[in-house]
Amino acid sequence: MRSGMNKMTVREIKSTFGRWIAIFAIVALGVGFFSGLRITRPAMVHTTNEYLREHDFYDFRLLSTLGLTEEDAEAFGALDGVKRAVGSVSSDALFSLGGTDSGETAARFLMLMPEMNTPSLTAGRLPQSSDECLLDRKYALPSDIGRKLYIAPDNDADTKDLFAHSEYTVGGLADSPLDLNYERGTTALGSGSVSCFVYIPPEGFEYEVYTEIYVTLDTDAAIYTDAYDAAADAMEPRLSERLTERAALRRDSVLGEAQDA
């Protein structure tokens, strides 16, 4: 009886072989697709984590309306669980690129820091003097290297005073870990959109205080893991408390300087 059933099964398969191959292919495709979906997230998280670690990406960005000082950075860096705290300067400003017909456009100018949020050089070289810069590779072409970038006169006085020079030479092109998306953000300037980022050495800015402090945690935990979330959640209230304390000290300092003037 079983032998006859086996023969019938074999005969059925042979007579409809194409159909069985199609069913097998559909099942194999479904299994492959499901396996791909299951591995996609871990693979993407791993790739992102490795990229951010390679470029020393920050964990917290601290802001204060009165600015932040080097003493503030040291105070945050002294907290247990903090690996590094670095002051930085950034500003949105209108600029024009010499030798092009782009006109004035808005860019986000960033301080080039060797120890945190380091860009990926894609063409040219890093700035070697205070009047050189790195330009967003998604905005410019390699042929733009060597051209002058002019700070537009239409910027307000405070913005223009933030720059040590009125023009900078494009030394290279780069990607930035601060701008992982294609869009570069919004601004109150120009059309309302940031067209690109521009990295300038610290000496290329004229500043008395930092506009932000970047903090990295002393942990090897990968992003999107429970261990990382726990470390970040534990650190956030401590940073917030220290920021409130430092802001009060900064306010008292500014008021004291105003009274002595």
Q: Over which residues does each language-model region extend?
A:
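Membrane transport/envelope proteins' first extracytoplasmic loop
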Residues: 2-261
